[in-house]
C-alpha cells in the first residue's frame, strides 16, 4: 500500500481471469466506513458545541438536546448499526459538555485587584500610540492596553516571559467582547504598576519556550537584514509574524487573495520537516517519532500556536504516529480525526475564522487534487506535468476556502486565481529555505548576512509586487462571481464518477 501525494490510499490488484482479460480491483480507502464515521463524529461534536454554548437556557438549545435524546433512544431500539449512532450521540454530548464548561469558565472568572506574576500569552502588539498585550493571570487570560513607559517596557518582552504587575481585573465591555471570549480572554487588566521579576523576566519561562523564543529571535535578526517592508513580509512568510506589516501591505494581500501566505500553515510545517528530514531518516523508529513530535511542538510554540498551526501540526503528528506504528492512513481520515480531537480539546475553535480557512484549504487539497488532476490530464496539460503540479494545488485550495471566504469576507476577487499561481511558488521557496538561511544570517557578520539574504529580498519583492498588481486590477463583481462559479463547476465536474472499461478489445 502506498500513500500518495494527497493522502488517499488506493490499492490496485490485477488478477488474471479467463482468456486475456484482466480485472483491476480498486480498494479506495478514502471511501471506507471509518472516513464517514470520523467525519460524522466531528460534525456531531460541532453540533454539540454549538448547542452547549447556551446550555439549557434557550428554547433552541433545549429543542436541540431533546432531538438528540429522542434520536438516541430511537437508534438504540431500532437501528442495526446502533453502536455507530450511539457513538455519534456520545460525541454530541461530549462536545456540548466541553463547550458549556469553557463558556462557564469565561463568564465566571474572578475579577478585582491583583498583585503578582503575569505571563505573556502573545507577543506585545503595537497599535497606534499604545501596545496591546494578552497575559495569563491566575490561569485566566486578560487583555491590557499600555502606553508610555509601560508600553516601552512591555515591548522588551515576548510571549512566555513573566512580569510583576499590580492592577485591577475588570470585565470586558466592548463590541469585541465575544471575539475576545472565543480566544479565552475573560476580561481586561488595568495595569497600574509593571516591573521585571527580580530573577529575570525568563525566570518562569519553560526551557522549551525559551528555546523557541531564541530561535524566533535569531530568525527576526536575519529578517531585519532585509530593508523596510521586505523584512516584515519575510517574517510573515517564514514564521507567521505579521506584527510589523503596515496596514497598506495587509490590505493589498487581502484584496489580491494572498493573505493566507502570511499565516503559518501546513506548507510551513512540511517545509520544516523537509529541512530536518535527513537527520530524522537516520534515526530508529521510536527516537524518530519522539524527535518529530518535539520539532512539531517547538514549531507550534515558535509560531505562537495559531489555529492554522494547531491544525497542521496535529495532522503531521498523527501521521508520524501512524507511520511509526507501521500502518498507513489517508489524509482525509487524519483531517477528520484532527477536527474531532481538537474540537474536544478547545471547543472555541468552532468560532475561529482562521481555523476554518485552514481546514477548508486542507480539505480542498485532499479531496480535489486528484480529481482535478485526472480531469486536466485529458487536456493538453497532460504533456506538461510541471504545469499540473503548479496549477492543481492552487485551484483545489482556493475551492476549499471559498465557502468560508464568501460567508465572512464576501466574494473573492477573480484576481486571486492568477495572483496565487504567480506568488505561491516563489513564496514556497522562501518558506523552504528561509528558516536555515535566516538563522545563519542572524549569527553571521553583517556583510555575509546581506549576501545570504539578498535572494530572499528578490523573492519577497516579487510576492509583494504580485499582491500590489492584484489590488490595482480589481475586476467588477460580476467577473468575480463568474470566476468563482467556473472554479466550483470545474471541481464538481472533476468529482463526478467516471466509468471506463479497460478490458474491451478493439
Give the positions of each predicted feature.
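N-terminal leader/targeting segments
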Residues: 1-107, 187, 207, 311
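C-terminal regulatory/interaction regions
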Residues: 2-16, 30-41, 45, 55-59, ...
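Structural detector for short beta-strands of small beta-barrel domains
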Residues: 112-126
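Hydrophobic alpha-helical transmembrane segments in multi-pass membrane proteins
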Residues: 40, 48, 79-85, 189, ...
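OB-fold (S1/OB) nucleic-acid-binding surfaces
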Residues: 128-146
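Aromatic-rich juxtamembrane segments at the membrane interface
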Residues: 13-52, 182-313, 320, 473
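Short nucleic-acid-contacting surface segments enriched for D/E, G, S/T with interspersed K/R
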Residues: 150-165
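Hydrophobic alpha-helical transmembrane segments in integral membrane proteins
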Residues: 93-115, 498-506
Amino acid at each position: 500500500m502506498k500513500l500518495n501525494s494527497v493522502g488517499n490510499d488506493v490499492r490496485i490488484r490485477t488478477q488474471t481471469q479467463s482468456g486475456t482479460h484482466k480485472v483491476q480491483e480498486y480498494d479506495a480507502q478514502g471511501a471506507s466506513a471509518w472516513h464517514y464515521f470520523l467525519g460524522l463524529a466531528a460534525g456531531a461534536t460541532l453540533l454539540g458545541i454549538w448547542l452547549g454554548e447556551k446550555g439549557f437556557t434557550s428554547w433552541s438549545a433545549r429543542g436541540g438536546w431533546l432531538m438528540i435524546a429522542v434520536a438516541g433512544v430511537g437508534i438504540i431500539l431500532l437501528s442495526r448499526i446502533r453502536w455507530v449512532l450511539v457513538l455519534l450521540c456520545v460525541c454530541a454530548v461530549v462536545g456540548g459538555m466541553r463547550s458549556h464548561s469553557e463558556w462557564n469558565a469565561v463568564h465566571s472568572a474572578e475579577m478585582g485587584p491583583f498583585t503578582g506574576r503575569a505571563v505573556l500569552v502573545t507577543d506585545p502588539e503595537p497599535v497606534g500610540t499604545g501596545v496591546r498585550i494578552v497575559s495569563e493571570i491566575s490561569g485566566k487570560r486578560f487583555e491590557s492596553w499600555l502606553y508610555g513607559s509601560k508600553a516601552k517596557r512591555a515591548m522588551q518582552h515576548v510571549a512566555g516571559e513573566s512580569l510583576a504587575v499590580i492592577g485591577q481585573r475588570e470585565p470586558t465591555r466592548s463590541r469585541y467582547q465575544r471575539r475576545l471570549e472565543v480566544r479565552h480572554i475573560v476580561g481586561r487588566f488595568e495595569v497600574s504598576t509593571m516591573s521585571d521579576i527580580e530573577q529575570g523576566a525568563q525566570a518562569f519561562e519553560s526551557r522549551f519556550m525559551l528555546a523557541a523564543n531564541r530561535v524566533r529571535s535569531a530568525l527576526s535578526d536575519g529578517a531585519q537584514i532585509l530593508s523596510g517592508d521586505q523584512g516584515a513580509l519575510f517574517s510573515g512568510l517564514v514564521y507567521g509574524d505579521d506584527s510589523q506589516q503596515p496596514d497598506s501591505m495587509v490590505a493589498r494581500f487581502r484584496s489580491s487573495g494572498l493573505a493566507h501566505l502570511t499565516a503559518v500553515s501546513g506548507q510551513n510545517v512540511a517545509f520544516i520537516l523537509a529541512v530536518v528530514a535527513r537527520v530524522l531518516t537516520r534515526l530508529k523508529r521510536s527516537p524518530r517519532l519522539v524527535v518529530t513530535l518535539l520539532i512539531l511542538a517547538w514549531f507550534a510554540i515558535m509560531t505562537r500556536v495559531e489555529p492554522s498551526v494547531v491544525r497542521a501540526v496535529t495532522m503531521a503528528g498523527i501521521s508520524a504516529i501512524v507511520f511509526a506504528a507501521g500502518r498507513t492512513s489517508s489524509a482525509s481520515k487524519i483531517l477528520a480525526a484532527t477536527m474531532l480531537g481538537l474540537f474536544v480539546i478547545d471547543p472555541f475553535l468552532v468560532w475561529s475564522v482562521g481555523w476554518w480557512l485552514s481546514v477548508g484549504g486542507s480539505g480542498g487539497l485532499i479531496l480535489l487534487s486528484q480529481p482535478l488532476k485526472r480531469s486536466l490530464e485529458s487536456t493538453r496539460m497532460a504533456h506538461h506535468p510541471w504545469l499540473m503540479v503548479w496549477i492543481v494545488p492552487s485551484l483545489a485550495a482556493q475551492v476549499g476556502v471559498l465557502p468560508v471566504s464568501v460567508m465572512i469576507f464576501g466574494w473573492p476577487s477573480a484576481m486571486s486565481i492568477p495572483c496565487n499561481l504567480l506568488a505561491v511558488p516563489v513564496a514556497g521557496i522562501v518558506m523552504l529555505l528561509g528558516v536555515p538561511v535566516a538563522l545563519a544570517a542572524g549569527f553571521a557578520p553583517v556583510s555575509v548576512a546581506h549576501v545570504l539574504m539578498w535572494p530572499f529580498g528578490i523573492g519577497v519583492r516579487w510576492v509583494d509586487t504580485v499582491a500590489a498588481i492584484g489590488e490595482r486590477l480589481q475586476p467588477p463583481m460580476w467577473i468575480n462571481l463568474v470566476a468563482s462559479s467556473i472554479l466550483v463547476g470545474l471541481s464538481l465536474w472533476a468529482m463526478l464518477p467516471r466509468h471506463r472499461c479497460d478490458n474491451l478489445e478493439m
